[in-house]
Amino acid sequence: LSQASHIIDQYQNLIDTNLLWVRSDKPVRLSDIGRLYTITKRFESQPVGSIAKSFWSNVTARPFLALAFLLATVAMALCYRVFIRRITAISSSVNGSNAMRLWPTLQAVCFTVCAALPVWLALSAIAWFLGRYAEPESTEASISNGLWVAGLVFLPLEILRQLIRPHGVATAHFGWPELVIKPLGQAVRRIGWVGLTLVFLATFLLLERYIHREISALARIVFAILMLFIAGTLWRLLDTKSGVVAGLRATQPDSLIAKLEWIWRPFIIAIPVVLAGLSLSGYAYAAGQLTVSLYQTIWLVVATAVLQGIAERWLLVSKRRIALRQLKEQVAIKEQAEASGAAADLLDVNQMKLSAIDEQTHRLINASVLIVLFSGLLWIWSPVLPALSFLESIVLWQELTPDGTISSTVSLSNVLVALPTLLITFVLVRNTPGLLEALILQRLPLDNAARYALNTLISYVFAF
C-alpha cells in the first residue's frame, strides 16, 4: 500500500510539473484569422431573450434570496454618498483632532471598501442567479462565469479607485505623491472602461470554445488582445517620466526597489506579452493559469502598498505621541531642576531620539514589506512554475539514522524558505529598540533607564 501511495505521489508530481507546458490547442495561423468572420457567423448562441428568461426563472424560483440580494445592493448604493462624506470628513481632520490616532485611518479604509461594494454586489447577484442552476457546459454558465471573473477584477479596481480619490485614504492618510496618484487613476479608468469588457469577452469565449471548438482561435485572439492591452497599460503606468516609477524615484530614490527598477519594470511589462504569445501558440491552459498568477501578483503589490501605508501612518502617529511625551518629560525635568537648583540638561541623556526611532522603525517596515512580497510571490508562482518545484529535488544534505534510513532531508527550497526568516530575525534584532518604543514602551509608566534596559534584554531574546 505504501509503495502504491508513493507511485501515486510520483505521478501526481509529474503531472503538476509538466501539465502546464502541454499544448492544449493548435497554434493560431493566419488562415484562422482570415476565417474569423465566417466562424462568428456560424457560431450559434442562444438569443439574449432566452438567457434573460432563464435568469428571471431562477429569480422567481427563489424570491426571498433575490430580495435579500436586492436589498443589500440598494442599501449599499444608498449609503455610497454617506461613505464618501465620512471618508472626506475623516481626511480633513487627520492632521487636526485625529493627528495622534490611528483608528480614523482604519475607519477610512473600511468606508473605502464599503464604497466599492454596490456594483460588485449587483454583478455577483446576476452571475449567481444565472449560473447557479445552469447546465455545466451551457451559454448561461459561460456568461455567468464571465460576469463572475469580471466582478473579481472590478472589485479591487474599484477599491483602488476609491483609495486614490481626492481627499481619499491614499492622499490624506498615506501621503502618496501626485506622481503616483495621477498615473494610477488613469490606469484604473482605462482598465475600467476597456479592460473589463475584454475580460468578460475573453472568459466567455474561452469557456464557450469547449462547446464550439471552431471559435478556439477567436477566443485566444481576444485573450491576446486583452494581454497586449494590459501590457500597454503597465507601460504607461510604470513610465519613468510620468508614471509610478517617476514618483518612486522622487520620493524614495535610495530604496532598493527604485534602484532595481531597470530590472523589474521591463520584466513586469513583458509578462502579459509572453502570455499572449503562449495563448496564440496553443498553450491556452498555461496562459490562463499564469494569468491568474499575474492577477494575484498585481493585487499582492497593491495590498502590500496599502499595508505599508497603514504602517507608515501608525509610525507617524507614534512619533507624535512620543514627541509629546518627551516634551512633557523635559518640561517636568526643567521645572524640577529649577525648583532644586540643579542642571536640567544632564537629566534626560537616556531619552531615545525621535530620529533613531524613525530610522529603525522605517527599516523594519521596509524589510517586512519586502519579505511579505517575496513570500507572497513564492506562494503565488510556485504551483505553476516547474523551476520552483524542481528546487525540492535539489538535496543539499540528509540526516541518516543508525540503520541507514533517511530521517530528514534539506533541499534548496527549504533554504530559500529559511532565508526570509533569517533576514527578519536580523532586522528585528537591529531595530527592536525603535519598534518597542513606538509600539509598547510609550504606553508604559517607565523611566528612561528602565526603557533602555528592557530594549537591551528583548534584543538579546531575538538574537538567541
Name what the model sees in each region:
Residues 53, 57-419, 423, 427-430:
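Hydrophobic/aromatic interaction determinants used to assemble and anchor large protein complexes
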Residues 1-50, 55-59, 71-74, 343:
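N-terminal targeting peptides and non-cytosolic leader segments immediately upstream
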Residues 325-334, 442-452:
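Short helix/loop segment immediately N-terminal to the Walker
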Residues 441, 449-464:
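Conserved structured catalytic cores and adjacent interaction surfaces
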Residues 393-398, 437-447:
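Active/binding-pocket-proximal capping segment
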Residues 94, 435-443, 461:
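A short secondary-structure junction motif
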Residues 420, 424, 440, 458:
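Active-site proximal loops enriched in glycine and acidic residues that flank catalytic Cys/His/Asp
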Residues 142, 146, 448-453:
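Internal alpha-helical transmembrane segments of multi-pass membrane proteins
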